[in-house]
Amino acid sequence: EKSRLGVPEVTLGLIPGDGGTQRLPRAIPRCKAAELLLMGKMIDAQEAYRIGLVNTVVPVEKVMPTAKEWAEQMCRCGPLAVRAAKQAMLRGCEMPLEDGLRLEYMLNAYVTSTEDFTEGTTAFVEKRKPVYKGK
């Protein structure tokens, strides 16, 4: 709730490094990215949430419990599927839509050939929690 975010490098005579000038305009509206990148403006947590830079805003005492809850939720999912979905999302955003769809199809073909896929679908039918092995 009390966090402030920004890319203040231009106020120091620098440009943001580590891909900031490339990643930020891909993550939020370009005009908002320009405002942050070109003026070194800082924003509060609510504004970061409003523009889609963060997924949620929580009080400081709930930051770690919330992060742990999110991590636990992700860990309950099939690790190979999570990895493939992440790869499709990150790589796919950087390519034309048709290429991204092809990548998604190939990754899905791989995932559906794994033991984890069989475990996940079997557990669903049997109404139990899956036990994934990353295989």
Predicted regions and their residues:
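Acidic, divalent-metal-coordinating active-site segment for phosphoryl/phosphodiester hydrolysis
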Residues: 41-47
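Structural motif
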Residues: 51-52, 127
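Terminal peptide-recognition signature
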Residues: 24, 48, 85, 124
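Interdomain hinge/lid region at the active-site interface
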Residues: 113-117, 123
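C-terminal long alpha-helix characteristic of the crotonase
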Residues: 1-5, 45, 54-102, 109-113, ...
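CoA-thioester-processing core
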Residues: 1-37, 51, 66, 70
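Hydrophobic alpha-helical segments typical of transmembrane helices
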Residues: 20-23, 32, 81-84, 104-107, ...
